[in-house]
Amino acid sequence: WNENWLKESARILKPTGAIYLISGWRFSGMYHSLLNTEFHIQTRITWRNSTPKDQPKSLTWINRISDIWFATKSNEFMFNQEAVTEGSNQMNPESAIEMGVTNLWSDIMDIQVGSTVKMEGDKPEQLIQRILTASSFKLNWVVDPFTRSGGVGVIAKKMGRRFIGFESDQDQLLMAMKRIDKE
């Protein structure tokens, strides 16, 4: 199943396009292997997810991170480092320009920010904004194969991107479409 949707993603992705796959630690290794068959993996971003809601109480270490796999169709891809550096709170601007942005994102919390209403399953607006800023320009297409409540679509629309979303649950898709149109 995962191989099928990743193959379709590779098929429709433009040559300079990118895929960002957000995963918890349990499935991260599997996704690394699967992505490696269709894409060029550029890096693994570690995002500090501060609210592990769906995680059972642990007898050992509580996981507070998610992996974001950044992969591209080719090694010639769009990456807007200057725009990401300007919008990053990770470091002061001088060292960001000197060092570049890092793959450790501890400055984005899993809480509601901005005017977008956060729905169940939505990632933080700032997280999606950073990803879209890094790998797209206004009027570029953003595809979300797991639209759920439409959070990525709402943010893409706010940022002037065109959006296509897929969702297997028809009721959920209709609610997401309504949400994207409204916001």
Predicted regions and their residues:
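Short, conserved SAM-binding/catalytic segment
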Residues: 177-183
